[in-house]
Amino acid sequence: MIGGRLIKVCGLRAADNMRAVAALPGVDLVGFIFHPASPRCVTDVPDVPLPDGVRRVGVFVDVPAEQIVATAHRYGLHLVQLHGHESPDMCRRLTDRGLGVIKAFPATPEAARNDTTRYATSGCRLFLFDTPTASHGGSGRTFDWHVLQDYVGQTPFLLGGGLGPDARDALSRFTHPRLAGYDLNSRFERCPAEKDVEALRTFLQRLDGASVPGQTSPASVRP
C-alpha cells in the first residue's frame, strides 16, 4: 500500500518481470489477463513465489464461471477481475466459491450512478472504474474523474484508466470516500506485458511522498 491505497499492477507475463514488480515496495496486487483479444494475454502464469501480502489477480471477460474457477485454482489466483458483462449473480457465485471478485465498470455517469447499484449485494470485494473502450481496458487513455462523483455506493473501488508516471500530482488532489487504490498498466510498459520496473519504482516513491487525501481504512479494503 501507498498512503493507505492499494496498488495493483496489471498485465504481467514473464517470470522475471513479475518477480521484480511484486518486490516493489507498495505493490499489493499483480494482475494477469486471460482475455485472448488483449496484447497482454497470458496462456500460463509463472510459478513465482510472491512476497508476503502480494496477491494474484486474474482478469477475465465474459468467461463462464466454472472456467474462471478452474483457472483460479490452477494458477493460485486470489482474486478475479471481471471486465465484461458478468451479472451480479455470477459475482455472487464466484464469491461463494471462495474467490475475491473485482467488478470493472466503464467510467460513465450511468455506470457510476446506476449500474453499480445492481452489484451492491453481489459480494464484490472491489469495483474498478476504467476508461470506456471496446477493448475492455489497457487502452492507456484517461477519463474525467469527475464522473465518479456520481458513485455513492459503499463498495470500495480502484481507479484505473491510463494512469501514468505523470499522474502523481492529480492523484494527490483527487478525493472520494470509497477510493481504495490505483490500477497501473499500459503506461508503465516497455512493450505490451513488460513493465518498466524503474518507472514504477520512481512513481511509487513519488506517490508515497505526496499528500494523498481521504484515505480509506486499509482493513476495509485489503484483499
Description of each model-found segment:
Residues M1-P223:
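Conserved N-terminal beta1-alpha1 strand-loop-helix module at the mouth
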